Amino acid sequence: MTPRGRIAGPRRRAVDAVAALACSVALCALAPRHAHAQVRTADPIARGIPLTSFPRLVPLGAGVYGYEEIRAPGFTTVSLVVIGDSGVLIADGQGSAAATQRMLDEIRTVTSRPVRWYVVGSDHGDHTGGNGVLPTGIRFIVHPTSRAQLRRDSAAVVPPVAMTSDREQVDIGGRTVEVRFLGRAHTGGDLSVLLPRERILFMSEAYLNRVFPAMRSAYPSEWIATIDRALAMEVDRYVPGHGFIESPAVSREELVTFRDAVRDVVANVQGLHARGLTAEQAIAAVDWGTYKDWFLAAQQGPIAVRRIYLELDGKLAAAR
């Protein structure tokens, strides 16, 4: 006999099942409709980010920011901003005086400390073109290869001295920043910036997030090894030179994806070279597969083929 008002046995279990189902339906109804995986792309529109959101500072830690600015044809150029007690360190600038000035103005919204250090992660103009507006007396940290290239390019600013080793520690007051040369990749002098405390590595153009591997001055096979060295480091978050800054876990996944893209592009072209095709024939025949939809694939694909042919033919030393 059961107490009055209670339901026993199979009827009780049936009622419980109905109640559980009702709760589940209600929770589904309350769940946010936008709770879905972020689209993996360098296209801000496809990611649901309006262009009016840029430029923007992306907080990465206490006194650490990524800076994302939109450049033609519609993807980001990324800089790193690190604030110390003695001043601010920037890694990579932007492609024009106006764009770099906007970055400096944005930095002033989060700190009044002076910009005192600048790391040349990439010597390409889309990262150095605005260096003429940097503060007078700023200290440049640059790889010797990149310094020589800036001089050949008649850049507006050529740093007076270059690094003398593959690693340099910079005390910016209350924190130490490590500048690393991990190997040739997108250029002959790519520098990365490590924040050991935050376990963040800014890789400049050695890491292009969902942007087709741009190789006009690259060392294709060495690029793969350089990324592998970065992946072996004690780092939680990898910050690219182009494409979006991701969460720590996604940043590692995307760096692996980019490493695989470089490897696959190189292997694809090696196969065409082995078949005896000329570079121009290879450009006509190549199939990039899923990478054909990445930013700049149509523009950078032919450049990559020609550069890899130079490497395979032992002619990179004579090229830029």
What are these regions (language model features)?
Residues 57-106, 191-195, 200-203:
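Conserved beta-strand hairpin/beta-sheet module of binuclear metal-dependent hydrolase folds
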Residues 98, 105-172:
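Active-site HxH/HxHxD metal-binding segment of metal-dependent hydrolases
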Residues 1-12:
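N-terminal secretory signal peptides that target proteins for export/translocation
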Residues 41, 59, 145-189, 196-197, ...:
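Metallo-beta-lactamase
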Residues 16-29:
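Bacterial N-terminal signal peptides
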Residues 91-93, 116-124, 141-145, 182, ...:
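Active-site neighborhood of phospho(di)ester-bond hydrolases with catalytic His/Asp-centered motifs
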Residues 274-320:
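C-terminal regulatory/interaction regions
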